[in-house]
Amino acid sequence: MEVSNLSGATPGIAFPPGPESCSDSPSSGRSMGSTPGGLILSGREPPFSAFTVLVVTLLVLLIAATFLWNLLVLVTILRVRAFHRVPHNLVASTAVSDVLVAALVMPLSLVSELSAGRRWQLGRSLCHVWISFDVLCCTASIWNVAAIALDRYWTITRHLQYTLRTRRRASALMIAITWALSALIALAPLLFGWGEAYDARLQRCQVSQEPSYAVFSTCGAFYVPLAVVLFVYWKIYKAAKFRFGRRRRAVVPLPATTQAKEAPQESETVFTARCRATVAFQTSGDSWREQKEKRAAMMVGILIGVFVLCWIPFFLTELVSPLCACSLPPIWKSIFLWLGYSNSFFNPLIYTAFNKNYNNAFKSLFTKQR
């Protein structure tokens, strides 16, 4: 297969033309999780340029950090009894999906990036397994973020009705729906003959390019959960704004008055001065709950913001590319894909940074190991 250099001044990094261009094929857009065009070694250039080594090193570090950090969170939740409850089961579900992304999806994606001509040489069966896990794990990771956002929303806005028993049932149901829906999206091509992932002639492994499946997979894996998390955070913002206004109205001013009374048995007048004051009806429990709600709202906001920044470039490309006669450089497709993968690295950093119990549990875990 003919390859072309990224630029004349950058040896060792090349990209194949053809199927990746929108103008070459009406269904050239790559569906969620498919093999990207990206960093591959040119047969006519030195096999290991400095830029290639740098990129590979960074991606290997990203894979290792994503795997180890999520594994640490998962082990902590399993070993610490205090974490055997909501919302830590949702965090555990997210950690499982992100561990699988780092262990099964990202390494083979890196191998595919570095293969000359992006040819898949591991066979049809392994191709189907890889693509299925790619779609399954990335979709589950995205929907788990939506589930965490929903749980925080109900906790903040309905803390009286959202009892511990209700919360357990809701979280278990959300986890079940997350993995069932992710499995349906991932296995639909195999179960219903919805396109083929492996092309033996071209030795190409990618998600089914069937246009109807592309719409189904991208909507189910990203656009629907995106709508959910944006709606949830808007409702959280409105609820926080309403509560702040209600607390301000709860501050009661007392007017300043002066009264004069005759002492019944004394020949003097007693003056009583009532000074102007404000009384806010707020207990220490309300203050603690308010601080907890603020941390939860901030955590959800950052989690959603990072989720959108990581995934929206990739999925916007997947939506626009099949509809226009344009050609996005393969290097950008790779950048957008790995930016999406990096969301699995940021997830545990965010939800542990806002919970001191995780930091204490990490310290305790390493102390016991010593």
Curated annotation (Swiss-Prot):
Record keywords, A-Z: Cell membrane, Disulfide bond, G-protein coupled receptor, Glycoprotein, Membrane, Receptor, Transducer, Transmembrane, Transmembrane helix
Name of the protein in question: 5-hydroxytryptamine receptor 5B
Record SUPFAM superfamilies: Family A G protein-coupled receptor-like
Residues linked to a glycan: N5
Gene symbol of the encoding locus: Htr5b
Chain's role: G-protein coupled receptor for 5-hydroxytryptamine (serotonin), a biogenic hormone that functions as a neurotransmitter, a hormone and a mitogen. Also functions as a receptor for ergot alkaloid derivatives and other psychoactive substances. Ligand binding causes a conformation change that triggers signaling via guanine nucleotide-binding proteins (G proteins) and modulates the activity of downstream effectors.
Tissues expressed in: Brain; in the CA1 region of hippocampus, the medial habenula, and raphe nuclei.
Keyword ATP-binding: no
Disulphide bridges, residue numbers: C127-C205
Organism listed in the record: Rattus norvegicus
